Regions:
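Conserved ATP/PPi-binding loop(s) of AMP-dependent carboxylate-activating enzymes
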Residues: 340-344, 353-385, 421-423
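Conserved AMP-binding A3 loop
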Residues: 35-38, 166-193
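ANL superfamily adenylate-forming
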Residues: 116-162, 177, 270
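Conserved AMP-binding/adenylation subdomain of ANL enzymes
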Residues: 189-208, 216-255, 270
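AMP-binding/adenylate-forming catalytic core of the ANL superfamily
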Residues: 71, 92, 98, 109-111, ...
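Conserved pre-ATP/AMP-binding loop-to-beta segment of ANL
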Residues: 22-23, 152-170, 177, 201-208
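Gly/Ser/Thr-rich phosphate-binding loop
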Residues: 229, 254-259, 268-332, 346
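Conserved AMP-binding/adenylate-forming core of the ANL superfamily
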Residues: 2, 6, 23-68, 72-76, ...
Length: 521
């Protein structure tokens, strides 16, 4: 029997949860706690404020802030107002933030104190923003607390639709421009029973859920939504700080958390790891990038809890496959697999000519399910290319073994995953090519013990021009987010290309992956 009712909208499920768990703790951050009843009341205030600012259902509301209970309030407020939350990646550079805010046509922008200088420097470039609200004190912008004080806490009582957009998360594109993936009530509610049958099967109103993944990321968004739906106590930290994470696992008796492999590695290497009591942990859900077998086995030994691997994309609501704890036994030979499809998810492997591959043959991974996004925001051509007959083309290449377990082999679209962040070569190459002395450039992902992969650039300079590796890296950091920037640069005379001019990334990548067994980390 399901732990929550089947409804048409996420709002209806939330409203049911608020009544079921009214006096239970919904959130804890530092020493502050908030009940589900208070969470519901504050979301009413946010929703009413959104309307008073002239926004309407389907308006986009952007947030550039680190994790906080205020962020969670805004998320619920957008749900109550039938507006759409646009979580901004706070690692983006100024021009990238401008693009996403304008592309999404966001009408309100909530900004955390860490990002005041950034927004001050670019606010004149916003085309649709009616108001900027400071999530703290600011000389010019109205503060979040002051803004909220003007509105009542009456329930807007809007009835949403199953096909309403709920969140719009931006994922980088092969053209170098991010695309907004539109996730609806239908998508999110399709994923909840899948979670309930797998890594959420033991979640309940007494569970302590750790919200440490950024809320602009599909993993962070999913974890907080599921934590609320299941009625957990959700412990929030601004960002994944290893010292704080280990401390809170002890003091808050954390039971479940999602972590990217790089964070797991940081925790294992932290000097406080050996003194941390992990006995409260029931499970770690991990994904967003590959993990080495050595790291995984050490983590299982040190933390002593169940491990669930998940594979999914922003466009699939973070849902695709999961590798259950019983298959984390090295003797079963599945540790390098990302698992089996959730119930309600169809996966096929397709060759370049469109035919379905035989077992063991590598092809593009395609997914069909109600979790597939409605589409990219105002990207008709990209939608036509990425979703055909309800099948989503992931751009990842993989194969099924004889037991139906999916193995990721390579990336059709050349995407690099570094520390759980998706990086597209085109974005980095566009930034490099803006340098006046660079006449050609290509980037690939190469192995990195800490991040899984890291960006390596190959650059051809104009004749008689000289620059150091440090010069190029420094320049790229002025153009794009630092996590996308090259960590190493090779200067070469010619970038290898095929007759049609396409960069031969495999030629550049191959020497670095020869000993790794597969061509992604």
């Amino acid at each position: 029997m399901s732990k929550f009712p089947r409804k048409e909208t996420l709002l209806e499920v939330y409203e049911w949860r608020m009544k079921q768990s009214a006096e239970d703790i919904a959130f804890k951050m530092n020493d502050d706690e908030m009940t589900y009843k208070e969470y519901d009341r504050r979301a009413n205030i946010i929703a009413n404020g959104i309307f008073k600012e002239g926004c309407n259902p389907n308006s986009r509301i952007a947030v550039l802030a680190k994790n906080s209970v205020d962020y969670a309030e805004i998320q619920y407020g957008t749900i109550k107002s039938r507006t759409v939350l646009v979580g901004l990646n706070w690692r983006l550079a100024g021009p990238e933030v401008v693009f996403v805010v304008n592309d999404s046509e966001s009408e309100l922008l909530f900004v955390g104190p860490d990002f005041y200088p950034l927004i001050e420097s670019i606010q004149d470039q916003f085309t649709h923003v009616k108001k900027i609200i400071a999530m703290g004190d600011h000389e010019t912008w109205e503060s979040y607390d002051s803004w909220k004080s003007k509105f009542d806490d009456s329930d807007p009582k809007l009835k949403g639709e199953n096909d309403d957009d709920v969140i719009q998360l931006y994922t980088s594109g092969t053209t170098g421009l991010p695309k907004g993936a539109r996730l609806t009530n239908k998508n999110i509610l399709a994923s909840t029973p899948m979670v309930e049958e797998t890594w959420g099967k033991d979640w309940n109103e007494r569970s302590v859920n750790f919200v440490l993944s950024p809320l602009f990321h599909i993993a962070g968004s999913n974890i907080i939504i599921m934590g609320i739906v299941f009625g957990c106590k959700n412990v929030v930290i601004p960002e994944p700080d290893p010292t704080k994470i280990l401390e809170l696992i002890n003091t808050e008796k954390i039971e479940t958390a999602f972590m990217v492999p790089a964070l797991i590695q940081f925790l294992l290497n932290h000097p406080n790891c050996g003194n941390t009591d992990f006995s409260s942990l029931r499970q770690i859900v991990y994904g967003a990038s590959p993990i080495s077998e050595d790291t995984l086995l050490k983590a299982m030994d040190v933390m002593g809890c169940e491990f669930w691997q998940v594979y999914g994309l922003t466009e699939t609501s973070g849902i695709g496959t999961t590798l259950a704890p019983e298959f984390h036994d090295p003797e079963k030979g599945k540790l390098r697999s990302c698992g089996q499809a959730y119930t309600g998810v169809d996966i096929r492997i397709v060759d370049t000519d469109g035919t379905e591959c035989k077992q063991g043959d590598v092809g593009e991974i395609q997914i069909k399910s109600d979790v597939i996004m409605k589409g990219y925001w105002k990207r008709d051509e990209a939608n036509t290319e990425s979703i055909v007959d309800e099948w989503f083309f992931t751009g990842d290449a993989g194969f099924f073994d004889e037991d139906g377990f999916l193995f990721i082999h390579d990336r059709v679209k050349d995407m690099i995953i570094s520390g759980g962040e998706n990086i597209y070569p085109a974005e980095v190459e566009n930034a490099l090519m803006s340098h006046p002395d660079i006449i050609d450039a290509a980037v690939v992902g190469v192995p990195d013990d800490k991040w899984g992969e890291t960006v390596k650039a190959f650059v051809t300079l104009s004749e008689d021009k000289n620059h150091s590796e440090a010069d190029i890296i420094s320049y790229s950091k002025e153009q794009i987010a630092s996590y996308k920037c090259p960590t190493s640069v090779d200067f070469i005379n010619d970038i290898p290309r095929n007759p049609s001019g396409k960069i031969l990334r495999r030629v550049l990548r191959e020497p670095f992956w020869e000993e790794k067994g597969r061509k992604v980390s």
